[in-house]
Every structure is written in structure tokens, then in C-alpha cells.
């Protein structure tokens, strides 16, 4: 959201710490003034290890700058479904922003998890984002099947996966503002649909979702489009562009859109090639907060509809939880020299 809607005249700079990676931490805080920094600690359960260690590192950074006690409370807030989160961070209750326990992280941008975006982009922009998402919700509820955009995308994806045997999907936006959207889509679809057990508890035979990848369309023409065009693999593709530019450089935009439309034609399967591509094009009039909200909600609804078609629960992630458990055991087996009984010998090397 922030990458798509930020401007060159932004008043607040927003930075994200997600991985437990000290290099990332140093690069971000190295350019910050602790006395002008607000830290938003966001975690649904408040048990995610990466969030905890980053919060502790930030806390230490503030302390080393002489920020503690009541001053610290002016520099840190918590967003969580865990009512004890603020207390656990030694912060007052007014620094706590609650979210619902029943909303998964990948569906939570519309909640207080979006606080950072609201602060950086402004409340009016964030409200427009919500309004756009709500408009898509209304469309899903009211539009007939033949005109229901998320349903059409879901049915196309389901057909590509189960009938045509296409196991991967490539997202190619021809717009710098949507460059990182593929990372969000990866989590949204693959964490929601990557299950081998159905909602009824039975093992699923056949595919459940596709591998999601992609990149900036124009740049990717010079890297993996050769493979898409003439390789022997099969790929479904969403190719997206905005008709109106978000800048004043008309010549650049004309070239960009020409490339997008040309590639939409070029990537379609030809008789002389062995590959099979199923290409869908999405054209947006212009990218603003409302349209971005609608676009994100479009893919959210597509994903949940695919869950219904595949017969799986798109709102849990048991594989992720298992990995967290093993990570914790390995971390503490090393620190306390326990044997790490659930881990194989390679993990303990």
C-alpha cells in the first residue's frame, strides 16, 4: 500500500522490519533520528519471533539514545489481537490498537494493521483505500456471475490449474507503484491455498493453487520473458497496466503502455511454440487509493473463492506454524544445548 501510494512530497517516511536480519535493521535505523521516530509493533498473536526480536532491538536502540520511561511511550505503539500486548511491552493501554482474532495477517490491511499506512499516507488516503475495497465487496455481493470480476478470475485460475495443468502464475504489472504487489499476492494465494488437506479433513487429490511469481513487466521483458515466450513450461499470466500515468512524463508512459499491450499479444501461445500461456489483461483507468483498495480486494475475493472451489480453508496456515515451532526448538536447543529432538541431523549442523 505504502509503495503504491507514496508521493515525492511525503511528510512521513515509512520503513518496515519483517525479518530477523541485522543487516536490514542497521540499514534502516542508521538513517533515522530516534527522537523523531514512531515505532509501530504489529503482530496478531504477539508471539511471532521475528517481531519480538526486532521490537527488542528497537527498544535497545531507543534506550541507547536516552529514550525510556514515559518518553518511550511517546515513541512506541502496539497493534495486536492479544489484549496483553501493550502490558507485555510495558506500554500504557492507550498505546494499544486492537485487531480481531479471526482475521489472518494476509487479510488484515483494512484493520488497525494498516495504522502505519494511515500515518504515512494520511487518514483521507487510507479512508479512500477502505472505500475502494468496500466497493469491490459490494460488487462481489451484487454482480451476476458473468460480470463478477473476482469470480471470473477464480474460475479462470481454477480451470488453468485443474484442467490445463498449469502449476504457476506470473503477475506482471507495468507500473512502478505496483512493483512489490507480487510479494503480497504470493503470501495471499500461496499461504491461503497451499494445503493438501481439505476443509473436511480429507486429503486432497490434485492441485491446490498455483506458485505465484512475477516482477515489473517492462523490466522483466529483458530477463524471463524469453522463457515465457519460447520455453516449454506452461504459465498463466496476469498482465496489468494503468491507462493514465501518475506522473507528467507522457512520452515515457506511451512507451510503457505500448510495451504492455504488445507483450499481452506476444505472450499468447502460438502454434509454432511448445509452451502454453494463458494470458489475462487488467487495465485500470488510473491508480489512486480507491482503485488500489478495489484491486487488492479483487484478489482477496478471488483467493477465498478458490478456497471454496478447491474445498480447502483459505484462512489458516498450519505449515507456517509448524516451521515456527521447529525454528524455536532449534534456537533454544542451540542456546541451552538441548538435543532438539524434533530436528534432523542436517538442521543441527
Q: Where on the chain are the PLM-derived regions?
A:
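Glycine-rich active-site/cofactor-binding loop and its immediate structural neighborhood
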Residues: 1-19
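A SIS-like phosphosugar-recognition module
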Residues: 8-9, 20-21, 27-349
Amino acid at each position: 500500500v505504502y509503495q503504491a501510494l507514496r508521493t515525492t512530497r511525503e511528510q512521513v517516511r515509512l520503513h518496515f522490519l519483517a525479518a530477523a536480519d541485522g543487516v536490514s535493521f542497521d540499514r534502516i535505523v542508521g538513517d533515522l533520528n530516534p527522537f523523531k521516530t514512531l515505532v509501530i509493533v504489529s503482530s496478531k498473536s504477539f508471539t511471532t519471533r521475528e517481531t519480538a526480536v526486532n521490537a527488542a532491538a528497537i527498544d535497545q536502540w531507543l534506550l541507547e539514545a536516552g529514550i525510556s520511561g514515559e518518553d518511550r511511550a511517546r515513541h512506541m505503539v502496539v497493534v495486536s489481537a492479544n489484549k496483553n500486548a501493550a502490558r507485555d511491552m510495558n506500554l500504557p493501554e492507550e498505546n494499544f490498537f486492537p485487531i480481531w482474532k479471526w482475521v489472518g495477517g494476509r487479510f488484515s490491511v483494512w484493520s488497525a494493521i494498516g495504522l502505519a499506512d494511515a500515518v504515512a499516507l494520511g487518514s483521507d488516503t487510507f479512508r479512500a483505500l477502505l472505500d475502494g475495497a468496500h466497493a469491490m465487496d459490494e460488487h462481489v455481493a451484487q454482480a451476476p456471475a458473468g460480470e463478477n470480476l473476482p469470480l471470473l478470475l477464480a474460475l479462470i485460475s481454477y480451470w488453468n490449474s485443474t484442467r490445463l495443468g498449469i502449476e504457476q502464475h506470473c503477475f506482471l504489472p507495468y507500473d512502478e507503484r505496483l512493483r512489490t504487489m507480487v510479494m503480497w499476492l504470493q503470501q495471499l494465494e500461496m499461504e491461503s491455498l497451499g494445503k493438501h488437506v481439505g476443509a473436511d479433513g480429507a486429503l486432497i487429490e490434485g492441485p491446490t493453487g498455483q506458485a505465484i511469481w512475477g516482477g515489473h513487466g517492462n523490466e522483466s521483458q529483458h530477463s524471463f520473458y524469453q522463457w515465457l515466450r519460447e520455453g516449454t513450461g506452461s504459465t498463466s499470466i496476469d498482465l496489468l497496466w494503468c491507462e493514465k500515468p501518475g506522473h507528467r512524463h507522457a512520452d515515457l508512459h506511451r512507451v510503457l503502455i505500448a510495451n504492455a499491450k504488445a507483450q499481452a499479444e506476444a505472450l499468447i501461445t502460438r502454434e509454432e511454440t511448445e509452451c502454453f500461456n494463458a494470458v489475462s489483461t487488467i487495465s485500470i483507468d488510473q491508480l489512486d487509493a480507491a482503485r488500489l483498495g478495489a484491486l487488492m480486494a479483487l484478489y482477496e475475493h478471488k483467493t477465498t473463492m478458490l478456497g471454496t472451489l478447491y474445498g480447502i480453508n483459505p484462512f489458516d496456515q498450519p505449515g507456517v506454524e509448524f516451521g515456527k515451532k521447529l525454528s524455536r526448538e532449534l534456537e533454544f536447543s542451540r542456546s541451552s544445548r538441548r538435543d532438539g529432538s524434533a530436528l534432523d541431523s542436517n538442521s543441527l549442523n
